[in-house]
Amino acid sequence: MVATTEQTVGKITQVIGPVVDAEFPSGKLPRIYNALTVKGTNPAGAEVNITCEVQQLLGDNQVRAVAMSSTDGLVRGMEIIDTGAPISVPVGKSTLGRIFNVLGEPVDEKGSVNVNETFPIHRPAPKLTDLETKPKVFETGIKVIDLLTPYRQGGKIGLFGGAGVGKTVIMMELINNIAIQHGGVSVFGGVGERTREGNDLYNEMIESKVINPDNPEDSKIALVYGQMNEPPGARMRVGLSALTMAEYFRDVNKQDVLLFIDNIFRFVQAGSEVSALLGRMPSAVGYQPTLGTDVGDLQERITSTKEGSITSIQAVYVPADDLTDPAPATTFAHLDGTTVLSRGLASKGIYPAVDPLDSTSTMLQPNIVGQEHYKTARAVQSTLQRYKELQDIIAILGLDELSEEDRQTVDRARKIERFLSQPFFVAEVFTGSPGKYVTLEDTIKGFNMILNGELDDLPEQAFYMVGNIDEAIAKAEKLKKG
């Protein structure tokens, strides 16, 4: 049903924190999810401009709404206007290179946005008949991901990792590669994270040329932020605002889109705060009773259609490292793969620090990726697993005490570990090494050559921070000549 755009005026009857109750004329009640606005001056002479979203119809012509910004300055009796439609955000090329809040207002002090079209943030998921059901691998050009945890086009990937292990750099490299190789764009939803991190990310994107501040429409990404200091209503809806911008690129521009959500746990946390404010009975561990529905409403819209795809990378915070907590447990049910970043690898200087043994993907099946890819990936994992098992023996007794076969395994595993590292385009400014995009074919060929013993005579440092295997061979020649 299409919402009418007829505007009705009501009166505020109660304000408790971010929750606003209002009374409307009989027969003219706003619908659930309609946006209500309060504009003007309050009796104290303070300017007020607040948008709320209707959550409950209370009876007696009363509605309960949740504010998207601070309710400071609101008083009982003020006029509140029903806009007749849900919150809508700008969509299209004009959003690229800009930072928006949950309402689609630019917050980067770069002036207004030339808005030709807006979309409501509450939209149905694509119909089953419109979905692309054949699983298709999304090539990222990053060796460790393409070989061991291949991403599904239109899939959802959880990105797990602590501070300083390289989540942001991987995100920026993916943004860069989808723009160059797939002609796609990206949308970043900053949900309930630190304002400083949002600012750092924006500046890093300018530095690595993902955002062009002089001509924003040449940028490869749109950013939507609802940071930690925002009211729970904004943090709960900012993910939907980002997703709506991504849906336009998929459905109207027919592009492949990357959607980053950082952090999906904060989305659930905000929903739980709103649920308590609305007086709902909490369920397990204090979460909202509608946890499954809330997460499902967001995740079901992230998918591949016959026109284009939205592939989503979601940073997942695990509270107290408890994977059975309802928030991460509900999220896991929707994920097609997990990319786990390891502090141990980062401390060795191996970047991207993706853990090859802990990371998983539902796409790593012979009937999807092919027999050769599957066998190579499994052989790489078993070699690394054996190396991990032998590390205690090596630490106590040294390499010389190992059997000939185990020594060979260790030698190849160390080469594999180094070959899983790769110079990134977005890190060129820091490393001084030109970035490399490695095709899946080259990746499989390289690892097969290491596993088959064809490169046993090359030094292991030749495999560190190179693109394909030919570069490793050339680097070995260079090292030989000194």
From Swiss-Prot:
EC number assigned by the record: 7.1.2.2
Tagged with keyword Metal-binding: no
GO cellular component, one term: plasma membrane-derived thylakoid membrane
Transmembrane stretches, start-end: none
GO function terms (MF aspect): ATP binding; ATP hydrolysis activity; proton-transporting ATP synthase activity, rotational mechanism
Stored InterPro entries: AAA+_ATPase, ATP-synt_VA_C, ATP_synth_F1_bsu, ATPase_a/bsu_AS, ATPase_alpha/beta_chains, ATPase_F1/V1/A1_a/bsu_N, ATPase_F1/V1/A1_a/bsu_N_sf, ATPase_F1/V1/A1_a/bsu_nucl-bd
Record's catalysed reaction(s): ATP + H2O + 4 H(+)(in) = ADP + phosphate + 5 H(+)(out)
Subcellular location, record wording: Cellular thylakoid membrane
Keywords: ATP synthesis, ATP-binding, CF(1), Hydrogen ion transport, Ion transport, Membrane, Nucleotide-binding, Thylakoid, Translocase, Transport
Family as reported in the entry's similarity comment: Belongs to the ATPase alpha/beta chains family.
Protein's name in the database: ATP synthase subunit beta
Gene encoding the protein: atpD
